[in-house]
Amino acid sequence: MDLYELLEPTLAGLGYELVDLERSPGGKLLRIFIDKPGGVNVDDCVTVSNHLSRFLAVENVDYDRLEVSSPGLDRPLKKTADFIRFAGESVKLRLRVALQGQRNFVGILREVKDGILKLEVDGKMLDLELTNLEKVRLVPKL
């Protein structure tokens, strides 16, 4: 079973969303990014870390170091639910295949529907296929 698929329901049961996970080359460092309504704090990270340490041992997942943190202000958007939740926000994204010779865009996420993300860039609306999105992140409001 995929590690993401293993962790997602476990974290949901604790009241957290699995935003992302990273594994270092060799798999010895495991980074888990979590969120919940209202955001996460250090106590949340400690709670999840303690729970996952035991859970991963039972599931026989090989790693040396576990890091649990919030996704940060520039959190990645990966799921359709993320795009719906953050509609109206500024995002920067990278496409797998260039559109009109360009792969990187910054704009306002307007909506996602039927596998198409609508991104407003300089007053123009772009229709981007979700399958062509390589990376999407929020642009922090400072």
Swiss-Prot record:
Q: Please state which protein family the record places this protein in.
A: Belongs to the RimP family.
Q: What is this protein called?
A: Ribosome maturation factor RimP
Gene this chain is encoded by: rimP
Query: Is Cytoplasm a UniProt keyword of this protein?
Result: yes
This protein's source sits in the domain of life called Bacteria
Pfam short name (any one): RimP_N
Job description of the protein: Required for maturation of 30S ribosomal subunits.
The residue ranges crossing the membrane are none
Q: Which organism is it from?
A: Nitrosospira multiformis (strain ATCC 25196 / NCIMB 11849 / C 71)
